[in-house]
Amino acid sequence: GGKSFVGTEFTYNDTALRDTDEDNHTLVSENQSVPVGNSTYNCYVVKSDPKSKRNIEFDYRIQYFDKNTYIPVKIEYFDKSGKMVKKMEVTKLEQLAGVTGKKHNLRRVAEITNMLTGRRSVLTILSMELDKELKATYFSQNWLSTGKS
């Protein structure tokens, strides 16, 4: 649930994609200007309420989806009283081509702030390879647990 991801303010839930069917979604705005880092994005704003609160450390979240890439450039997490407890912002988006030449819009730098403690963590992806075939051993229980085959 809310376990820290390698000692940061990110949790394992923050680093995983949630299935859209796990939440009830409400469109709050179709055209909101949202400043994030050095950029301003034209966003769809969506309120997402988890259908099950089990293993979830927030009551609901507000997501700001960039209308050009459909990437959530900002996510605000709220508790039951409506107080913002955490905020995640993508401070660097980048378009990269994979080995096949296909272009992908990707989050390069994400920053998360714990509003209760003031602690902040920055996750930076320094390098990546796209559209590359992966060995099946990367998905074994041992590899996923230890990083070793």
What are these regions (language model features)?
Residues T15-Q32:
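A short, amphipathic edge element
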Residues G1-R18, G37-Y138:
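Gly/Pro-enriched, hydrophobic low-complexity segments
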Residues K135-S149:
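Short, low-complexity, Pro/Ser/Thr/Gly-rich segments in the mature regions of secreted, periplasmic
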